[in-house]
Amino acid sequence: MKRFNVSYVEVIKNGETISSCFQPFQKNENYGTITSANEQITPVIFHNLIMDMVLPKVVPIKGNKVTKMSMNLIDGFDCFYSTDDHDPKTVYVCFTLVDMPKILPIRILSGLQEYESNATNELLSSHVGQILDSFHEELVEYRNQTLNSSGNGQSSNGNGQNTISDIGDATEDQIKDVIQIMNDNIDKFLERQERVSLLVDKTSQLNSSSNKFRRKAVNIKEIMWWQKVKNITLLTFTIILFVSAAFMFFYLW
């Protein structure tokens, strides 16, 4: 059975990469295609895209949320990111081929945050592998349950009964259909999630602008108050000087 994988995972803290994991591409005719252009994609390309295009758009959201980038960063790939619920300055980014199950990057990005540390490439690769193994085991279990319930392993006897091979092919097709439906639903959810992220970002920007305006208004008010005090003081001294001069003039006269 096909083993699904992710293409690239990177962990960033305070704007610096602390670990990364790259999975070389493998051709498989059953689940999507790998083009020659895909095969030329390197970890450096993924890393540069993350630094230049992903991090500037990251909006920390509480609750271990995963966001899908709606912008097409690179043909044939989807990009997902999540911020650490306990440390918003830690960002997890994952690239997958577009035909991979969308639940997979969600499982990866959420699962990585449950580990105590992903501080080295070896640790990150090990943790990603464990999550992928768990996902693969679930698919195998689902396939076996479907096979057992679809004819109980009947073989062909010439009377139109399904062979084990036919049942296996039907099961594979069913898994593909389930994955496609799941992808469509998750895509809709993640699109809403990105809109929420953008709304949070805009709200944060508005709050920041409001605070800056409020501080400027207070500063201007203080400047105007001091200017008023200076004007009153100057006017007072002018009046005193004028009165003193007038008094001396009349006194000497």
Curated annotation (Swiss-Prot):
Residues 147-166 are annotated as: Disordered. Pfam families: Nyv1_longin, Synaptobrevin. The keyword NADP does not apply. Residues 1-231 are cytoplasmic. The chain crosses the membrane at residues 232-252. Residues 167-227 form the v-SNARE coiled-coil homology domain. Keywords: Coiled coil, Membrane, Transmembrane, Transmembrane helix, Vacuole. One of its GO terms (biological process) is intracellular protein transport. Residues 253 are vacuolar. Its main location: membrane. InterPro entries: Nyv1_longin_sf, Synaptobrevin-like, Synaptobrevin/VAMP, V_SNARE_CC, Vacuolar_R-SNAR_Nyv1_longi_dom. Present with 1885 molecules/cell in log phase SD medium. Present in a pentameric cis-SNARE complex composed of the v-SNAREs NYV1, VTI1 and YKT6, and the t-SNAREs VAM3 and VAM7 on vacuolar membranes. Interacts in trans with the cognate t-SNARE VAM3 during the docking step of homotypic vacuolar fusion. Interacts with the vacuolar transporter chaperone (VTC) complex and the vacuolar Ca(2+)-ATPase PMC1. This is Vacuolar v-SNARE NYV1. It comes from Saccharomyces cerevisiae (strain ATCC 204508 / S288c). The lineage of its organism: Eukaryota, Fungi, Dikarya, Ascomycota, Saccharomycotina.
